[in-house]
Amino acid sequence: MELSDVRCLTGSEELYTIHPTPPAGDGRSASRPQRLLWQTAVRHITEQRFIHGHRGGSGSGSGGSGKASDPAGGGPNHHAPQLSGDSALPLYSLGPGERAHSTCGTKVFPERSGSGSASGSGGGGDLGFLHLDCAPSNSDFFLNGGYSYRGVIFPTLRNSFKSRDLERLYQRYFLGQRRKSEVVMNVLDVLTKLTLLVLHLSLASAPMDPLKGILLGFFTGIEVVICALVVVRKDTTSHTYLQYSGVVTWVAMTTQILAAGLGYGLLGDGIGYVLFTLFATYSMLPLPLTWAILAGLGTSLLQVILQVVIPRLAVISINQVVAQAVLFMCMNTAGIFISYLSDRAQRQAFLETRRCVEARLRLETENQRQERLVLSVLPRFVVLEMINDMTNVEDEHLQHQFHRIYIHRYENVSILFADVKGFTNLSTTLSAQELVRMLNELFARFDRLAHEHHCLRIKILGDCYYCVSGLPEPRQDHAHCCVEMGLSMIKTIRYVRSRTKHDVDMRIGIHSGSVLCGVLGLRKWQFDVWSWDVDIANKLESGGIPGRIHISKATLDCLNGDYNVEEGHGKERNEFLRKHNIETYLIKQPEDSLLSLPEDIVKESVSSSDRRNSGATFTEGSWSPELPFDNIVGKQNTLAALTRNSINLLPNHLAQALHVQSGPEEINKRIEHTIDLRSGDKLRREHIKPFSLMFKDSSLEHKYSQMRDEVFKSNLVCAFIVLLFITAIQSLLPSSRVMPMTIQFSILIMLHSALVLITTAEDYKCLPLILRKTCCWINETYLARNVIIFASILINFLGAILNILWCDFDKSIPLKNLTFNSSAVFTDICSYPEYFVFTGVLAMVTCAVFLRLNSVLKLAVLLIMIAIYALLTETVYAGLFLRYDNLNHSGEDFLGTKEVSLLLMAMFLLAVFYHGQQLEYTARLDFLWRVQAKEEINEMKELREHNENMLRNILPSHVARHFLEKDRDNEELYSQSYDAVGVMFASIPGFADFYSQTEMNNQGVECLRLLNEIIADFDELLGEDRFQDIEKIKTIGSTYMAVSGLSPEKQQCEDKWGHLCALADFSLALTESIQEINKHSFNNFELRIGISHGSVVAGVIGAKKPQYDIWGKTVNLASRMDSTGVSGRIQVPEETYLILKDQGFAFDYRGEIYVKGISEQEGKIKTYFLLGRVQPNPFILPPRRLPGQYSLAAVVLGLVQSLNRQRQKQLLNENNNTGIIKGHYNRRTLLSPSGTEPGAQAEGTDKSDLP
């Protein structure tokens, strides 16, 4: 059995993955893909690396990789929000070369090499919500993360952050705690002095020297003044003054030591006070570690020099001086460990706070990106209506069953259709990049004109552009707006023609009436309009004249005679207009007006010779169109148009900001705000009990108690070092019984060595397996760790006190009858009973060494120690102290050694307990921040899943990666040419006859409901494995457009036409699907499908509403194969037939047909009807449905719920005095500042559930 079976993984083979557990009760989510499109793009989207809410380490050094555990038990099957699981989170970060371990197989650690981009098991990907390549470890923040060996961390002098701003914020973050510690230390010292004064006046054998009283009052006054200054300046954010006040406090205490050495102290020779000063310097004064070390060494050296130069004892020996030096060295060593590891813990807590703040900021950024993506699909008024309906939906899992369509009916609108004449020829002469650039600039210009003329762009269909006026805000002049829009479009296209020398023009049709608008289907959502009037506007365009605006009688009636018109004769050019007897007219516009440039066009700065290039643009110098998705995934994450007129969906009032900066500056600002909130200890009052510091939530307390203590080994090694110092101190003093003392300390050292061995065994493969298993269990078990800690403290305590048992003092003699010969020279250790107390103090400091030991347990242990010492010094061995006092302080105004010793221990008890309380509070606050950060990160993960759904429904995956993964500072528009692509159009000819706008079918809404079901079924077919190479492009009314072979992998695949076969299979599957729908809807719809293949140009155009589309002869031919086809049949041209017939498909020859736009140059086209497959494709697996798609309503619902949670947290964090959490986003929160509705109430809104 390998060691990896015993303890957690270490080394480069580790993989840090978090597999999100599907929500309970949601069967569909179990199969949802875990891989997100944002996986490799997070760093580029947010301009900084993703700082996760978990531990990361550095993989350097021979000691192993620096690693740490998952914050709240994030094992492989852990679901963070419930804080379930058995793994635990570490309290401290690990520096370079450090090593951390976990339970046997229960934890997974981060790997710095970053393999998160690999695909996970099950084919779904393993991203979870972290990507380690962009996740800096804690060591990335530190100048020096410390040195570790075999899991034991040793202090270093420099323990600061690399960033000055981060260091400044850290100092401010713990400013309040350090201020409080300094005040408590000074108050404790003042109380000690007052207690000494009272005891001295009541118990001293001689009156107090007046100079002692003056010095006592002076130093007490200094400390009171320091406390007052620190308290008065509590609002100061600078930590420098606090450090200087700490230096002043240290100087005052050291001066008192000097006074004691000169004979003017109340604590005898002052050794005990030196120990307290050293402990306070390292653990309670706000001094950097380097300053504390210098101060500690200075204090120790001063005391040793005073003992040598001005001896205060009757008998002084070199051994005694060395013992004092060793005593001070021990306290300095323990203090350095305590100070370094405490500061490390506080820095870790600060980093966790920073991670929490950054997670919240990223969540807000994800909210904004979600909103932008939604608004790129839907107009604002539709989003408002959906949010208003969803605002009270609280069921977390309802979004997975939420299938509502939102159809709005608007009366009195005008619809404009515009088509670029000559575009087909243009697409054959321009390169892909040039074509997409021209279209983007042209349609960006149209979008700008639409805004100026109060029109809403609906959709771009290849080279067709259509918009509506009077939607959503009703306008009396909607027809005028559309006519002016059309005139501006004609001016613009003629300007383009003059600049590019290409024969292009606009054919425009306008009709007035009513529309239904909304979004249908589950994939490639696009806002669209439907109605009989929309069809008429479309036919007016197709039956129009290039360069003229073709309008209907309904539109003419709305114009009120403001424009000159002439007969349009549309019936002569369009069968639909003739069949329905629609009168048409042409707007008469002076030719010179049409030839003039649009008013907003200024002279370009480019020369005409440059413009004659085939790649030339026509954009003027003062304006250039935005790139698609710049306002969504661009580096300047500016707020979307949400902030204008409007919706304050963003948490923490981010909508008031000009930019959302996710860089360090914004995070630091947020941390400053968090510091202000934290200063009120609100979090502590809400979650932590006052004295015990236990969590009020028992499950949270259990989770905290199960945390792995990453510095437990370091604490135990430090305790062992303290034992060695205790042994050295007592060995330096002479003993009459050397052998018993040798045996005693040998046993204690062996026992403590065994404790160290058993807790570090997992790092030594040479040790027995059972020992390594035991080691792993101890390190992961709260109770076992506490047993080891208590055993270590007990051993040190026994080492400090057992030597008193070997004293030769006759205990049978009553103390009151004792007489002492002051001239006698004692060379036995019992002659120095104060060292039993001093080493006992070191044993008490051992409690402070164990940073994670519960402060209440520390208090209990310390009280037991003091009780035992009180029992020994006041009763059994009181004579030792009396004899010592008579020998060294006879006749002086000196308080008894045993009284001073108990007071010294009481000082240490209070100091160690308070220090333990501060550390535990920091650790528990750290834990709370981590839990909160992890919850918010999981919320961000959910939002990213929604965003991935949104993005996947706007762009194909490989195109989305293009926009997310690359540095697009100077990047051109996305465009790509393909040589071997399959294109399919599938329409439902009978749906036009089925569609009617009557009261019975809710003015056409019920007809659209059925169309939504049909499109949704088609979309779900794309979720099958066999159709993974097919991309839906769009729906055009009741026509479904799909393409195969767009992914780069398929272009280089050996099976060049495998995707075309899949497209043919897909068309056959569509016919089967429509038959199933007919059975349930009692209809007889038939599909008319056209398929073609060849070269196309693909690209993304439009900045505010980006659209992915394809252009070229192949697209036109596929569309004509549909429009010239036969209901219930699949028509393909001869070239496509020649490929598919060899792939197992059967065909029926139709004959030669005339195809508009192609037959003019190439003659009639031979076409065939696809009948089906003759033989199955051996490479096609049985149909397996991939995870289902969510409706747009479901995605918006997820966004609303996330925003509600953020709003509730915000109000809680801000401690709203109203006591009422209004956490829901309703229609009022989404109104403009003036309080008016942003649009007219939609009529006929349908919100009933789909079957």
Curated annotation (Swiss-Prot):
Motif window: Essential for CALM1 interaction: 38-40, 49-51
Activity regulation annotation text: At rest, the N- and C-terminal domains interact, as part of a larger autoinhibitory complex, with calmodulin pre-associated at the N-terminal domain. Upon a calcium rise, calmodulin becomes calcium-saturated and subsequently binds to the C-terminal domain. Fully calcium-saturated calmodulin then leaves the N-terminal domain, binding solely to the C-terminal domain, and the whole autoinhibitory complex dissociates, resulting in activation of adenylate cyclase.
Pfam families: AC_N, Adcy_cons_dom, Guanylate_cyc
Residues binding Mg(2+) 1, per UniProt: D419, D463
One cellular component term from this protein's GO annotations in UniProt: Schaffer collateral - CA1 synapse
Site-annotated residues for Essential for autoinhibition maintenance: V1200
GO molecular function, one term: metal ion binding
Single GO BP term: memory
Biased composition (Gly residues): 56-76
Cofactor, free-text remark: Binds 2 magnesium ions per subunit. Is also active with manganese (in vitro).
Region (Involved in CALM1 interaction): 1109-1251
Transmembrane segments: 183-203, 212-232, 247-267, 274-294, 296-316, 321-341, 716-736, 738-758, 787-807, 831-851, 861-881, 894-914
Phosphoserine modification, residue list: S614, S624
Keyword entries, A-Z: ATP-binding, cAMP biosynthesis, Cell membrane, Cell projection, Coated pit, Cytoplasmic vesicle, Glycoprotein, Lyase, Magnesium, Manganese, Membrane, Metal-binding, Methylation, Nucleotide-binding, Phosphoprotein, Repeat, Synapse, Transmembrane, Transmembrane helix
Omega-N-methylarginine modified-residue sites: R55
Involved in AKAP5 and PRKAR2A interaction: region residues: 1-109
Keyword Cell membrane: yes
Region (Required for both calcium stimulation and maintenance of autoinhibition): 1200-1215
Segments of this protein annotated with the region Disordered: 50-92, 1223-1251
Topology in the lipid bilayer: Multi-pass membrane protein
Site (Essential for autoinhibition maintenance by promoting interaction of the N and C termini): L1199, L1203
Root EC class: lyase
UniProt domain comment: The protein contains two modules with six transmembrane helices each; both are required for catalytic activity. Isolated N-terminal or C-terminal guanylate cyclase domains have no catalytic activity, but when they are brought together, enzyme activity is restored. The active site is at the interface of the two domains. Both contribute substrate-binding residues, but the catalytic metal ions are bound exclusively via the N-terminal guanylate cyclase domain. The two transmembrane clusters are necessary and suficient for the plasma membrane targeting and oligomers assembly.
Family: Belongs to the adenylyl cyclase class-4/guanylyl cyclase family.
Function: Catalyzes the formation of cAMP in response to calcium entry leadings to cAMP signaling activation that affect processes suche as synaptic plasticity and insulin secretion. Plays a role in many brain functions, such as learning, memory, drug addiction, and anxiety modulation through regulation of synaptic plasticity by modulating long-term memory and long-term potentiation (LTP) through CREB transcription factor activity modulation.
The name this protein goes by in its record: Adenylate cyclase type 8
